Amino acid sequence: MALVETEYRGQVMVVRMNRPDRLNALGVQLRAELAQAFVEFRDNPDSEVAVFTGTGRAFCAGEDMKESLERGTPGRGAQPLENPFMDGTLDKPVIAAINGFAMGGGFMLVERTDLRVAVRGAVFEISEAKRWLLGGYGHGLIAGL
């Protein structure tokens, strides 16, 4: 089963995380499929804008800690992949459609977008801050929100 679904609606590419049973938590496979989707978006001359969302009651709950613990790398995430969305080289707009939780790494994904639209009751949280920890590199973008 694909953890990231893409569909085209004219010049709009919809990128949807599809791991609702884990609140779209960021595991190795989901990260790889997101990277692939955003490379496809970047390279498609017919795509002008992407709408980025998640299936179920969460946009993204952040790092998949269960998978991270099984890998033996708790809290460190997976190895970086070529992802024009995350590395700042994407020159097309991305709109976040936030349908619930955007926590930790999910909040970081929201930070990378150009426009954010959220349902009433959406939850934004940087969990690391509750424990006086430094979050991922993306949290430096908060000032731009």
Enumerate the predicted regions with their spans.
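Conserved CoA-thioester-binding segment of acyl-CoA-metabolizing enzymes
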Residues: 1-55
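Hydrophobic/aromatic residues within transmembrane alpha-helices
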Residues: 15, 52, 64, 109-111
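Histidine-centered beta-alpha loop that forms part of the nucleotide-sugar donor binding/catalytic region
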Residues: 18, 63, 99, 121-122
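Glycine-rich acyl-CoA binding loop
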Residues: 23, 27, 99, 106
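An acidic, glycine-rich surface segment that forms the CoA-thioester-binding/catalytic face
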Residues: 31-35, 39-43, 65-99, 138-141, ...
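Short active-site-proximal "capping" loops at secondary-structure junctions
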Residues: 55-59, 65-67
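CoA-thioester-processing core
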Residues: 83-91, 97, 103-145
